[in-house]
């Protein structure tokens, strides 16, 4: 919905400072005003100084100005505007005695608003004329599906979260699990998919792709642990492959983190909690800059909630936005991160019940115990990105982005103990601990062009986009000895080079007032070059070099479309269909092969209802969907990564609601159901409910996030406060051999109080101190020792979830701005 900018109603001119000499040339002061929903000026900042005396005079006048507030439809909005004030030299002494200067009539030298608002005309001819630029956030583009969520984190940041990954829980149908430790990427469950650590969900950070091709731990591995939560302003979660801009790995959907720091000044936070957990964060937004300019540093360290769970990591993220002209801005972004962590891995349920683990015999010690202490990992990541945005005539836009990523990761895991090794004759098993390493560089370009076309007097959005990405990585897996941890066998060792070139076209039109159609197509090509460094030194024809080169090519096209019917001004019916794809893992390709890919076909239909666009609003959504994948992947304990199983299908539904009231109460709730099955041979594709249930994917997921903010007077001093609640409900997960896990119910709470620039907070995660299993499996293993006979019976394995965790936090807010009138 278009935004109407504020219009001046009363604008008395500033008074010429008495303590300055007569002017010989004009003096310009550029002010940034915050105009609230009532049209009052609530805050004034100097963007461009004309000297301290002139700054004070301009600010004193601005505080007396009144406006008709900006509006989106009929709802008044709080916005920021840039107002230039000119102090002109007088032509004669008589005029000088008046000691007044009016803002000069001129065009704004600042860029136009991101929402395309034009400078308003003066409300009355006798008022001084000046121009403004609305600096509000542009409205989110219309959703391509009911499951396309543009999520403002806002007040829900009060809910306890360990990392930015947990923000995904704000979207319906999302569950996270981590069996690898504090620093290992989370396993994402979305829309009935076990997306692993990213194989079926595309993850981006302001356009920079985070999925890693041919990763040793799994194709598409995406670690978001390096993202500083305080810097995440928005989250876009597109469930399903319905937007032409969605690329590789967007099988279950796409998640994009959008960064920004609304608050200016310094925010420093230090926390300490259970298990010696320590967290120190520092974020800074220069007062004279926009939310797109910030610096953030985050340090985390702790012993973990059990043996071999210690962790330590540090990260930095910085971004600046430069104005290159009235219509052009340049955004520079950089991030650097390093982490090291331990992992307890999985334990057998029978060993926990019988107290066989090498820990104290009490139930809690056994529950949080481990077998192999040589588990854990380390990770490093460095990102640089440059984005140039130009606004064109008629509301068009041209965006160009270049990025480079340097990445290194190493992990060690043991899922089966002593089962997979084929030792030399007469020797015992050496152990199944698997080391997976990944190191490489990614460079790429991304861009989009919106020409701003108008047909028959109506805007018809058309977007053209492209992506070019090149990965040069070394990926390897080795088996490690149980004693000493030395490698004794190489599982695979590949030097991989992958080039992905893609382009898409999307358009939107409204042939009828109540009907909006969207459509588009995406084309992707992949060129794979693999140097296999783990070939045998001898074959049937004799000795050979233990290396081999493989090259392959892949191509796929993905059409997508949706239709939106406006049943009432607030109620819409949206139906979407689309094809998506997941590229091949280069390690499994043959020379000169036309690289296969996993094709996903998905459809969704549902309703959306929204009331309010200002500080209070209520939004309801609900939909049903069906999805079919030509080649799915399921976790294999023998390799420690996902392996292909053939086609699969999903049938599901979800509902979500978000209620915001006057920046005091913010509640979001969702409930999702999905059934994932593997169809029987020859089964009809039109029966997505038939087939064998896929393991590890929960069928029912529920989530509630809520925050309440207020203020009170304590000892005649105003004190701000907030309380927050997070609740996750996870239904039973099917396991192999017709087994099911237990349901999980978790509650997290937090409370904060702020006096002036100091804030104290406390958070409690898993308030009820539940003993829950974060990941659960059912398979054959042998952890009794290298000489013990292996059992052929599958048994339950699990990784323990965190117990009750309490954390206290001290936060200090510094504005670093000179006090002005």
Regions found by a protein language model. Name each.
Residues 3-5, 11, 93-157, 165, ...:
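Short, acidic, small-residue-rich periplasmic hinge/interaction motif at the N-terminus
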Residues 165-212:
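Extracytoplasmic beta-strand/coil segments of soluble accessory domains associated
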Residues 208-239, 257-258, 358, 637:
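Short acidic/polar hinge/loop motifs at secondary-structure boundaries
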Residues 272-301, 306-345, 375-397, 456, ...:
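Transmembrane beta-barrel wall of Gram-negative outer-membrane proteins
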Residues 282, 397-415, 566, 572-578, ...:
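Membrane-embedded beta-barrel scaffold of Gram-negative outer-membrane proteins
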Residues 328-332, 377-537, 566, 618-624:
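Face-selective signature of the C-terminal outer-membrane beta-barrel domain
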Residues 449-450, 513, 517, 525-526, ...:
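Gram-negative outer-membrane beta-barrel transporters
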Residues 667, 729, 753-821:
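C-terminal beta-signal and adjacent terminal beta-strands/loops
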């Amino acid at each position: 919905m278009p935004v109407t900018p504020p219009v001046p109603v009363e604008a008395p001119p500033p008074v010429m400072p008495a303590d300055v000499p007569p002017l010989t040339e004009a003096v310009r002061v550029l002010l940034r005003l915050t105009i609230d929903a009532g049209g009052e000026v609530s805050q004034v900042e100097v963007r461009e100084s004309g000297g301290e005396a002139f700054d004070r005079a301009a600010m004193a006048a601005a505080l007396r100005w009144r406006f008709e507030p900006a509006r989106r439809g009929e709802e008044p909005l709080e916005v920021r505007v840039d107002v230039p004030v000119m102090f002109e030299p007088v032509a004669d002494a008589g005029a000088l005695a008046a000691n007044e200067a009016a803002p000069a009539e001129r065009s704004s030298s600042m860029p136009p608003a991101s929402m395309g608002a034009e400078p308003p005309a003066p409300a009355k001819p006798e008022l001084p004329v000046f121009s403004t630029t609305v600096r509000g956030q542009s409205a989110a583009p219309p959703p391509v599906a009911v499951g396309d969520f543009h999520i403002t984190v806002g007040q829900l940041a009060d809910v306890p979260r360990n990392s930015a990954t947990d923000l995904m829980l704000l979207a319906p149908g999302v569950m996270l699990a981590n069996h690898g430790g504090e620093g290992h990427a989370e396993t994402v469950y979305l829309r009935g998919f076990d997306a692993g650590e990213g194989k079926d969900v595309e993850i981006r950070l302001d356009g920079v792709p985070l999925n890693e091709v041919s990763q040793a731990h799994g194709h598409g591995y995406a670690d978001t642990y390096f993202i500083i939560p305080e810097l995440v302003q928005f989250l876009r979660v597109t469930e399903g492959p319905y937007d032409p801009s969605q690329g590789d790995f967007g099988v279950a959907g796409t998640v994009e983190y959008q960064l920004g720091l609304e608050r200016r000044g310094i925010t420093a936070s230090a926390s300490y909690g259970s298990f010696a957990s320590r967290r120190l964060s520092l974020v800074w937004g220069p007062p004279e800059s926009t939310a797109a300019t910030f610096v953030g540093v985050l340090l985390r360290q702790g012993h973990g909630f059990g043996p071999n769970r210690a962790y330590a990591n540090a990260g930095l993220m910085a971004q600046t936005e430069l104005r290159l002209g009235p219509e052009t801005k340049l955004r520079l972004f950089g991030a650097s991160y390093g982490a090291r962590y331990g992992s307890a891995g999985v334990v057998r349920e029978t060993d926990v019940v019988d107290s066989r683990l090498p820990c104290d015999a009490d139930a809690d010690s056994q529950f949080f115990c481990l077998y192999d202490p040589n588990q854990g990992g380390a990770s490093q990541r460095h990102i640089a990105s440059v984005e140039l945005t130009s606004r064109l005539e008629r509301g068009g836009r041209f965006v160009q982005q270049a990025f480079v990523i340097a990445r290194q990761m190493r992990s060690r895991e043991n899922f089966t103990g002593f089962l997979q090794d084929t030792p030399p004759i007469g020797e015992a098993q050496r152990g199944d601990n698997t080391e997976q390493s990944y190191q490489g560089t990614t460079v790429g370009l991304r861009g989009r062009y919106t020409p701003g076309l108008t047909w028959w007097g109506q805007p018809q959005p058309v977007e053209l986009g492209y992506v070019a990405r090149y990965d040069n990585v070394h990926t390897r897996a080795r088996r490690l000895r149980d004693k000493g941890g030395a490698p004794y066998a190489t599982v695979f060792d590949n030097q991989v080079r992958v080039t992905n070139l893609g382009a898409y076209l999307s358009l939107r039109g409204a042939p009828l007032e109540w009907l909006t159609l969207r459509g588009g197509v995406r084309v992707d090509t992949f060129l794979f070059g693999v140097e296999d460094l783990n070939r045998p030194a001898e074959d049937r024809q004799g000795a050979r070099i233990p290396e081999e080169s493989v090259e392959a090519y892949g191509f796929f096209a993905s059409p997508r479309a949706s239709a939106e019917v406006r049943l009432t001004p607030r109620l819409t019916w949206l139906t979407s269909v689309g094809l998506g794809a997941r590229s091949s893992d280069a390690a499994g390709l043959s020379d000169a092969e036309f690289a296969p890919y996993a094709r996903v076909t998905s459809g969704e239909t549902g309703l959306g209802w929204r009331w309010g666009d200002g500080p209070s609003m209520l939004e309801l959504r609900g939909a049903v969907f069906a999805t079919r994948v030509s080649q799915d992947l399921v976790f294999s304990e023998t390799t420690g990564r996902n392996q292909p199983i053939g086609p699969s299908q999903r049938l599901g539904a979800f509902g979500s609601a978000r209620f915001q009231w006057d920046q005091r109460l913010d509640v979001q709730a969702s409930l999702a159901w999905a059934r994932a099955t593997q169809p029987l041979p020859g089964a009809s594709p039109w029966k997505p409910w038939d087939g064998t249930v896929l393991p590890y994917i929960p069928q029912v997921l529920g989530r509630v996030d809520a925050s309440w903010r207020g203020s009170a007077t304590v000892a005649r001093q105003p004190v701000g406060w907030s309380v927050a609640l997070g609740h996750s409900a996870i239904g039973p997960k099917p396991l192999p051999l017709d087994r099911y896990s237990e349901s999980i119910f978790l509650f997290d709470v937090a409370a904060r109080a702020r006096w002036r620039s100091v804030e104290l907070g406390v958070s409690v995660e898993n308030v009820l101190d539940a003993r829950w299993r974060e990941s659960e499996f059912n398979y054959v293993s042998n952890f009794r020792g290298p000489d013990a006979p292996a059992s052929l019976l599958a048994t339950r394995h699990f990784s323990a979830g965190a117990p009750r965790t309490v954390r206290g936090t001290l936060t200090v807010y510094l504005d670093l701005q000179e006090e002005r009138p």
